[in-house]
From Swiss-Prot:
It is found in: Cytoplasm, Cytoskeleton. This is Vacuolar protein sorting-associated protein 1. Residues 26-336 form the Dynamin-type G domain. The lineage of its organism: Eukaryota, Fungi, Dikarya, Ascomycota, Saccharomycotina. Residues 178-181 are annotated as: G3 motif. Present with 5960 molecules/cell in log phase SD medium. Residues 618-704 form the GED domain. It comes from Saccharomyces cerevisiae (strain ATCC 204508 / S288c). InterPro entries: Dynamin, Dynamin_GTPase, Dynamin_GTPase_CS, Dynamin_N, Dynamin_stalk, G_DYNAMIN_dom, GED, GED_dom. Residues 247-250 are annotated as: G4 motif. The keyword Metal-binding does not apply.
Length: 704
């Protein structure tokens, strides 16, 4: 069952490989990613785990593409002489016969003339299905060849992985992703920004939450300066998904060891550290086999005074077992999430494929008819609040128009104040002008109407502005509808629908504006002084009288009760010399010379201090203007939105389908309108590929 779990992830890796590998796959698979500097011994650790020399070697960047290494434990046939430890206590069977040992030392397993049944371990590449590599030197050459095929021979790098599966009775079932080694300085013809390129690639792999980071670090250098560990801590600062490997333990200075690191007293990691010993360059040149190196590693830890008591927690065999255990545990934890993610992603691409439409296109006429019908229905639905997808984040469609009506427009109307333009002197002047040559005995209706009509005209600007705002909102709905993928399929038709819709709105805006202006003119034309909500003139005069002459109630000093009011015995006001309409134009000096009459100035204004009567009349008119203006505000705030609903909004909802059919359906260029977008064609191919891959992935995980 445990091996089946890892095998399932291996199959998923292969299934998702066409998507560009682990860094670009939409599914975050649990995997162990191997990071470290070029000099950390990363490749040697992997070869020790496999028990074979198969990775490219050389100077500079050797690993230039991620290598997804899938190790499959293959039980040997009964006829084979090799004794394999099935309990996984040993990684490599050291009792292999002499003939096999000689083959290992030579590094050659010839494929020619030998049947598959005679071989116990081999490699297979995903890009070469069905071909088995028994010669591990050939595996190395194929890795180099496939790397150069994508990156070229100029030491460039690529994030597209190479998938290699190795079957052997001498390995534990395990999956590792070998990433390019970190480097500081470009060598040879490497790009000048090679350090940044490698770091960016590694971060794409190890940043994924389901990635276990295997950080390979040289023990004979300061751990705090380890490139691999520093990179791991960028994405995993707490060390919760990082395991450390300490190489070159045998090369440390005399009297030093890694006990403090192993105990977690330096840089603690959740999975801890495991010390190993690799072959040096001299060992490789002298053809020292990996089996011999593993035996030397075992003896080193068993005999070293610092490690002998913990030798069974050191070395490559323990590293392989621990990685196997970590990966299995990680897979068990993440598998439900992976299943859900695969199903959700599959559904997403299936829906997109449906929106993109099938490859076999219907007749041009039926396509145009279908698109116009869909557009008209969706437009009406958005206006009425019946859209398929209602947002919970922001207002849209008809709700935005309602906001424009009842918030934006109403606030604009309410903010109009007639007295920010009308001054008391203006009222005084109009009162005298409206009375003509004979002074008026009462507050003039003419002055009131003149002033009110002037102020009603001010409602025209915000009302016409409302037409523009509603126009913009309807265009916004248009853009919301045609932004859907199904409209992107036919860009010419989408553009035609958009243009015709906007032109329709522009045409409808003209009579709408005229209607709005007529409504304002109607309010100006007839001032309804009999309106039931209008303040009566007598009420206004009483209010002004109380304001100008507040009555003081006498109080009985003995009882504290108000005394009865005495009837007023006021006399007619005495007109002072300086009061009156013309008082401001003539000084006292001129009054004495009335015999010498002069012509009035060309521009004659009502100036000077107002009389008590003028003050009262002015205040009365102001009260009446304020009262009537409030009535007009309510009327305008109510009737103008209704006018727009009639002339623009409802008209567009009921007439747009008919207009679009008249303009677009059955025209000569209808074939051009239904020509598919190249982007749509390409996207459909991509979605079909994704659906196929994800269906395969879904079938793989459904068996677990």
């Amino acid at each position: 069952m445990d091996e089946h779990l890892i095998s399932t992830i291996n199959k998923l890796q292969d299934a998702l490989a066409p998507l560009g590998g682990g860094s670009q796959s939409p599914i975050d698979l649990p995997q162990i990613t191997v990071v470290g500097s070029q000099s950390s011994g990363k490749s040697s650790v992997l070869e020790n785990i496999v028990g074979r020399d198969f990775l490219p070697r050389g100077t500079g960047i050797v690993t230039r593409r991620p290598l997804v290494l899938q190790l499959i434990n293959r039980r040997p046939k009964k006829s084979e002489h090799a004794k394999v430890n099935q309990t996984a206590n040993e990684l490599i069977d050291l009792n292999i016969n002499d003939d096999d040992k000689k083959k290992d030392e030579s590094g050659k397993h010839q494929n020619e003339g030998q049947s598959e049944d005679n071989k116990e371990e081999w490699g297979e590449f995903l890009h070469l299905p069905g071909k088995k590599f028994y010669n591990f030197d050939e595996i190395r050459k194929e890795i180099v060849k496939e790397t150069d095929k994508v990156t070229g021979a100029n030491s460039g790098i690529s994030s597209v992985p190479i998938n290699l599966r190795i079957y052997s009775p001498h390995v534990l079932t395990l999956t590792l992703v070998d990433l390019p080694g970190l480097t500081k300085v470009p060598v040879g013809d490497q790009p000048p920004d090679i350090e940044r390129q490698i770091k960016d690639m590694l971060l794409k792999y190890i940043s994924k939450p389901n990635a276990i980071i295997l950080s390979v670090n040289a023990a004979n250098t300061d751990l705090a300066n380890s490139d691999g560990l520093k990179l791991a801590r960028e994405v995993d600062p707490e060390g919760t998904r990082t395991i450390g490997v300490l190489t070159k333990v045998d090369l440390m200075d005399q009297g030093t060891d890694v006990i403090d690191i192993l105990a977690g007293r330096v840089i603690p990691l959740r999975y801890g550290y495991i010390p190993v010993i690799n072959r040096g360059q001299k060992d490789i040149e002298h053809k020292k086999t990996i089996r011999e190196a593993l035996e030397n590693e075992r003896k080193f830890f068993e005999n070293h005074p610092s490690y002998s008591s913990k030798a069974h927690y050191c070395g490559t065999p323990y590293l392989a077992k621990k990685l196997n255990s970590i990966l299995l545990h990680h897979i068990r934890q993440t598998l439900p999430e992976i299943k859900a993610k695969i199903e959700a992603t599959l559904k997403k691409y299936q829906n997109e494929l449906i929106n993109l439409g099938p490859e076999t296109m219907d007749s041009a006429s039926s396509v145009v008819l279908s698109m116009i019908t869909d557009f008209s229905n969706e437009y009406a639905g958005i206006l009425d609040g019946e859209a398929k997808e209602l947002s919970s984040q922001e207002l849209s469609g008809g709700a935005r128009i309602s906001y424009v009506f009842h918030e934006t427009f109403k606030n604009g109307v309410d903010s109009l104040d007639p007295f920010d333009q009308i001054k008391d002197s203006d009222i005084r002047t109009i009162m005298y002008n409206s009375s003509g040559s004979a002074p008026s005995l009462f507050v003039g209706t003419e002055a009131f109407e003149v002033l009110v009509k002037q102020q009603i005209r001010r409602f025209e600007e915000p009302s016409l502005r409302l037409v523009t705002l509603v126009f913009d909102e309807l265009v916004r709905m248009l853009k919301q509808i045609i932004s859907q993928p199904k409209y992107s399929r036919y860009p010419a038709l989408r553009e035609a629908i958009s243009n015709q819709f906007i032109q329709f709105l522009k045409d409808a805006t003209i009579p709408t504006n005229e209607f709005v202006v007529d409504i304002i003119k109607a309010e100006q034309t007839y001032i309804n002084t009999a309106h039931p909500d209008l303040l009566k003139g007598s009420q206004a005069m009483v209010m002004v009288e109380e304001k100008l002459h507040p009555r003081q109630v006498a109080v009985d000093p003995k009882t504290g009760k108000p005394l009865p009011t005495q009837p007023s015995s006021s006399k007619a006001p005495v007109m002072e010399e300086k009061s009156g309409f013309f008082g401001g134009f003539f000084s006292t000096k001129n009054k004495k010379k009335l015999a010498a009459l002069e012509s009035p100035p060309p521009v004659l204004k009502a100036t000077g201090q107002m009389t008590e009567r003028e003050t009262m009349e002015t205040e009365v008119i102001k009260l009446l203007i304020s009262s009537y203006f409030s009535i007009v505000k309510r009327t305008i705030a109510d009737i103008i939105p209704k006018a727009l609903m009639l002339k623009l909004i409802v008209k567009s909802k009921t007439d747009i389908q008919k207009v679009l059919l008249e303009k677009l359906y059955g025209k000569q260029d209808i074939e051009e309108l239904t020509k598919e977008n190249d982007i749509t064609i390409q996207r459909r191919k991509e979605c079909k590929k994704m659906v196929e891959i994800l269906r395969n992935a879904s079938q793989i995980v459904s068996s677990v």
